[in-house]
Regions:
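Short, surface-exposed coil-to-beta transition loops
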Residues: 206-210
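Fungal secretory targeting signals
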Residues: 1-19
């Protein structure tokens, strides 16, 4: 009984911990501001605009180091996925480009080369210019009926290659020996979440997810993975690895690599570092919104990708296929999918927190590739702006969680020995995936 009382007595101290923002700021932001004071021992990460000839890491624009390919994440897609990775070049042929008020600025049929930073839709008035930020790719077909082009392509079972769905690789020089490799994964459709069995909510045409591998002097140091506009960062050594044969061009070599594993959630394609159920967007002990991951088909994006470098303003293709496609399409900052359906549309539904069909996402150059910190942006409840790089894998929960993940309960297992049971239930209500447990997990990684 005494240990139980003591446990409840110290809960307020854990609650107070969440309001101390300087305990866990982004390590790279801290290093840049107070490098000498903190004694990190490594030079600061620079934004592309700060790089000089003396601090440059890559020898020239368009150069993609071999270590970037060798450490490309492998992606376990969900075993019952419906919307698999897709080819942006094929995807674009099923759309025209419209403004928010449904004025067509570029009609079908489209090719990838038709996308750009802006459009002059009328010959009569060549000075009339529509910035791409104000446009939407608008489907010619009824996407509610799952046309074939919306479904994407499964990876080859033996190799993990997807012949008809190249990943997009954008490498950014961050100076002083640092290099960021952004791997973008494109899907034609995002199937949203179910809330208490109802849904899906938050569906949208087009889906861009990505991961960031940050290198220092050719060695991977950190891995960040996107999820619902936010994401999670890890120390690279903490993430699960899988052995794979190294490829030199299209041929296998004799070298064996250890590649990081990430897990793509069913429908939403959010990325996680473990198998199971993952609550998202609602903090602490609420699990109204959850993603699900498992060890489904394995995708190796390094076997088919389009590679570029980016210096904060200019995109440079890495080889012939990318040069043939051009780079203008990457400067398209509009929505890669339809505008949110009008409430009068019979396909549209509403629940108190979300619509069934929402705006499509923006593309790769809208993902803050110039950032010096690891995180793309912060969730609405992360008011202190923390971006911790975890030192251990954040485990999934639920029936999909793997046995060695302690039933997916994470730090909630601390409560198992509390007696009497009513006191344990009270502690679980407050702590299990609640404020105290969340805070402990957040600050300890």
């Amino acid at each position: 009984m005494i240990p139980s009382v003591l446990l409840l007595a110290i809960l307020p101290w854990y609650v107070l911990g969440v309001v101390v923002p300087w305990l866990d700021n982004d390590p790279f932001v801290e290093a840049n501001l107070h490098a000498t004071k903190l004694g990190f021992g490594l030079p600061p990460v620079l934004s592309p605009g700060e790089i000089t000839d003396e601090t440059r890491t890559l020898p020239h624009e368009g150069h993609i180091p071999h270590y970037v390919i060798d450490n490309c994440p492998l992606v376990h897609l969900y075993s019952e996925e419906t919307y698999w990775p897709a080819d942006v070049s094929e995807f674009i042929r099923h759309f025209n480009i419209q403004t928010g008020n449904k004025s067509i600025v570029k009609d079908a049929p489209l090719e990838l080369q038709d996308l750009s930073a802006g459009f002059s839709p009328t010959v009569q008035d060549p000075d009339y210019f529509v910035p791409s930020e104000n446009t939407f790719l608008t489907a010619l077909d009824d996407f509610g009926k799952d046309p074939k082009w919306l479904l994407g392509h499964r990876p080859d079972y033996s190799t993990g290659r997807i012949k008809n769905a190249p990943a997009i690789l954008i490498v950014v020089d961050k100076g002083n020996g640092w290099v960021d490799a952004y791997w973008f994964y494109f899907y034609s459709f995002n199937l949203g979440a179910f809330i208490m069995g109802y849904g899906p909510w938050g569906n949208h045409v087009g889906d861009w997810e990505h991961s960031l591998v940050r290198f220092y002097q050719g060695k991977p140091q950190y891995l960040w993975m996107s999820a619902h506009g936010g994401g999670q960062a890890y120390i690279f050594d903490a993430v699960e690895k899988k052995t794979r044969v190294q490829y030199a061009g299209a041929k296998e070599s004799s070298r064996i690599l250890e590649r990081p594993l990430i897990f793509s959630a069913r429908g939403t394609h959010a990325n996680y570092a473990s198998v199971g159920q993952h609550a998202h967007d609602v903090p602490f002990f609420f699990s109204a919104l959850s993603d699900f991951t498992d060890r489904g088909p394995l995708w190796d994006p390094s076997l088919n990708y389009l590679g570029y470098t980016y210096n904060g303003s200019v995109v440079t293709p890495a080889s012939g296929p990318e040069e043939k496609l051009g780079v203008d399409w990457l400067y398209f900052l509009g929505r890669w999918g339809d505008k949110q359906l009008n409430w009068k549309d019979p396909r549209q539904k509403w629940c108190p927190v979300q619509w069934r069909f929402i705006d499509g996402p923006r593309g790769p150059l809208a993902k803050h590739l110039e950032r010096t910190g690891l995180c793309q942006r912060h969730k609405w409840w992360n008011f202190w702006g923390g971006c911790p790089a975890r030192r251990s894998i954040k485990r999934g929960q639920g029936l999909d969680a793997e046995h060695n993940d302690l039933v997916g309960d994470n730090c909630g297992i601390l409560l198992y020995r509390i007696r009497p049971k009513w006191l344990r239930s009270l502690a679980r209500l407050v702590m299990w995936r609640g404020i105290a447990c969340f805070t402990m997990d957040y600050f300890t990684g």
